Amino acid sequence: MPPTVDMGIPGASSSVAVNPTRKRVLLAEPRGYCAGVDRAVETVERALEKHGPPVYVRHEIVHNRHVVSTLEKAGAVFVEETDEVPEGAIVVFSAHGVAPTVHAAAAERNLHTIDATCPLVTKVHNEARRFARNDYDILLIGHEGHEEVVGTAGEAPDHVQLVDGVAAVDNVRVRDEDKVVWLSQTTLSVDETMEIVERLRQRFPKLQDPPSDDICYATQNRQVAVKAMAPECDLVIVVGSRNSSNSVRLVEVALGGGAGAAHLVDWADDIDPAWLEGVTTVGVTSGASVPEVLVQGVLERLAECGFDVVQPVTTAQETLVFALPREIRSAR
């Protein structure tokens, strides 16, 4: 067994090849499915088992093309809005969460709803409602148009201002500088979010933090693993779809952490052989909505190109499991 060595970041270790010139893959651990994604995907699968197709799903259940395609083949029908769902039918809300207006629209059509919102997103929704009840200005750090941001803002539309990047800080206006709090989208870059928070705090010294971290444990863990291996990587390949915020952030983290290059791929066929020219060490990770089968496909493709040594870079162990929505627990 190759030796285990310190990777230079607390808690990170890797089995590193004795010959540093041999082509190798550093494989980030943890990677792939988080507890919220696992719960959401299983929710649709169990709903199909219990009720039979079609089961309607508002928006992509998670941001991954492979997952959506697989569920479509099983009988899931993905729609943009609830008015596309036949009255009285079953509809699943995606892991990203929805605004109260969506619940109301579903009720008007007598839809049978199953809410697959990630519990960590629900936590942010609850925070938004609580601070709005106390008449705070809520500065929501996130990406404009992202489903999660739309849902969270919809919980308190009269109190929430979106802060999309450091440049947006200068445009923020509040009513009372003593009653300002920041919340965030759960899938952001930790470093970028903290940069925005510090800039906000320069403007509003009494800015309050959320009661607990809004950026989810899985997002943070995957970014830490990428940071651990990035300095040793000529190239980092992130498996994930382009509309997946947390996957895109992993590319940014890899580049910021010292990787020579970083690319986002949906699957192995997206790998450009030119990326591998002159490369000795390739880092591989995947976003929180990516099934492991897609990572294995990438590893097989890299092995065909001579990268047949795979060494883990482990920074955390994940054991969290979320209970399924009560509407479909009996289907287990």
UniProtKB/Swiss-Prot annotation:
Q: In which pathway does it act?
A: Isoprenoid biosynthesis; dimethylallyl diphosphate biosynthesis; dimethylallyl diphosphate from (2E)-4-hydroxy-3-methylbutenyl diphosphate: step 1/1; Isoprenoid biosynthesis; isopentenyl diphosphate biosynthesis via DXP pathway; isopentenyl diphosphate from 1-deoxy-D-xylulose 5-phosphate: step 6/6
- One GO BP annotation of this record: terpenoid biosynthetic process
In the UniProt entry, which residues are flagged as the active site?
148
Q: Which keywords does the record carry?
A: 4Fe-4S, Iron, Iron-sulfur, Isoprene biosynthesis, Metal-binding, Oxidoreductase
Its EC number(s): 1.17.7.4
One Pfam family of this protein, by short name? LYTB
Write out the GO MF terms: 4 iron, 4 sulfur cluster binding; 4-hydroxy-3-methylbut-2-enyl diphosphate reductase activity; metal ion binding
Record-listed [4Fe-4S] cluster binding positions = 34, 118, 216
Q: Where does (2E)-4-hydroxy-3-methylbut-2-enyl diphosphate bind?
A: 63, 96, 146, 186, 244-246, 289
Tell me which residues bind dimethylallyl diphosphate.
63, 96, 146, 244-246, 289
What's noted on cofactor binding? Binds 1 [4Fe-4S] cluster per subunit.
Q: Identify the enzyme class.
A: oxidoreductase
**Record's catalysed reaction(s):** isopentenyl diphosphate + 2 oxidized [2Fe-2S]-[ferredoxin] + H2O = (2E)-4-hydroxy-3-methylbut-2-enyl diphosphate + 2 reduced [2Fe-2S]-[ferredoxin] + 2 H(+); dimethylallyl diphosphate + 2 oxidized [2Fe-2S]-[ferredoxin] + H2O = (2E)-4-hydroxy-3-methylbut-2-enyl diphosphate + 2 reduced [2Fe-2S]-[ferredoxin] + 2 H(+)
Q: Which cofactor does it need?
A: [4Fe-4S] cluster
Entry's transmembrane regions: none
- The residues that the entry says bind isopentenyl diphosphate are 63, 96, 146, 244-246, 289
| Signal peptide boundaries | none
Classification via NCBIfam families:
ispH_lytB, PRK01045.1-2, PRK01045.1-3, PRK01045.1-4
- Which HAMAP family did the record assign? IspH
By sequence similarity, the record places it as follows: Belongs to the IspH family.
Q: What does this protein do?
A: Catalyzes the conversion of 1-hydroxy-2-methyl-2-(E)-butenyl 4-diphosphate (HMBPP) into a mixture of isopentenyl diphosphate (IPP) and dimethylallyl diphosphate (DMAPP). Acts in the terminal step of the DOXP/MEP pathway for isoprenoid precursor biosynthesis.
- What PANTHER family has UniProt attached to this entry? 4-HYDROXY-3-METHYLBUT-2-ENYL DIPHOSPHATE REDUCTASE
- Any idea what this protein is called? 4-hydroxy-3-methylbut-2-enyl diphosphate reductase
Which organism encodes this protein?
A: Mycolicibacterium paratuberculosis (strain ATCC BAA-968 / K-10)
